[in-house]
Each structure stands twice: as structure tokens, then as C-alpha cells.
Amino acid sequence: AECSVDIQGNDQMQFSTNAITVDKACKTFTVNLSHPGSLPKNVMGHNWVLTTAADMQGVVTDGMAAGLDKNYVKDGDTRVIAHTKIIGSGEKDSVTFDVSKLKAGDAYAFFCSFPGHSAMMKGTLTLK
């Protein structure tokens, strides 16, 4: 089973994919995020955040209030299944999470929680 994915977030506010499938044979799953653009993280920073589809908007709203120092993710937010830090031009970050946290048939969303980005930078994650 392929238990990781490489994703890029660019200066055009786009992720390189809008759908991720996690094989249920995987014990853990790793997301490797990179930023091929030229803009710094305070201007065009990106992260990768995973929640249920239902929780996405609330996490985005609370993340905006948390600010850049907290990677636009509220401290101790139990709705967040996994997240990377905010990265800028030329930077990378990875996150690994337990696949046991996912349920087959549930709808999951991944997105960038940098203010204003989630409308374009989002996708679905499915356990198969």
C-alpha cells in the first residue's frame, strides 16, 4: 500500500491535488507538503489541515483568530485530525497520522487554513 502523498502549495493558491485516497491497509499515513513558489509564508503561506468535512469551516474560522504564530490552527483543537505547520517559499513540512482515526464512509476535507485560502485550497480525503 502507498501510505504517503506529496503535495505542493503554490503562489497561485493551489494544491497540486484535490483528492487523496488512504488505503485502509496503512497503519499510518504521511503527507509531505512543499512550497515551490517564491512568496514568503507571511504573504502566501500554506499548511495542510485534515478534518471531517462538517468541521472544516469552524476550524478555518477559529484558525484565523489563532494567527500565523500558531500556524492558523487553534491550540488543542480536537476537530483537527492532522496538520502541518505554515510554510513559505522553498520550505517543506510533513505530518503523519494514525489511519485508525479515519472511518470508512465518512467525508473528510483537507485544506489550507491561511486566511482566505480554504475556498480554493481544499480537497477530499477518502479511506478505501
Swiss-Prot record:
Subcellular location(s): the record lists: Periplasm
Protein keywords: Copper, Electron transport, Metal-binding, Periplasm, Transport
Example of a GO MF term:
electron transfer activity
Q: Name one Pfam family in it.
A: Copper-bind
Q: Does Metal-binding count among this protein's keywords?
A: yes
| Gene Ontology cellular component list | periplasmic space
Which spans are transmembrane here?
A: none
Q: Which residues form the Plastocyanin-like domain?
A: 1-128
The highest taxon in the source lineage is Bacteria
Entries under PROSITE patterns matching the protein: COPPER_BLUE
Q: Where does Cu cation bind?
A: H46, C112, H117, M121
As for what it does, the entry says: Transfers electrons from cytochrome c551 to cytochrome oxidase.
Q: Which NCBIfam families does the entry mention?
A: azurin (TIGR02695)
Name of the protein: Azurin
* Species per Swiss-Prot/TrEMBL record: Pseudomonas denitrificans
Organism lineage:
Bacteria, Pseudomonadati, Pseudomonadota, Gammaproteobacteria, Pseudomonadales
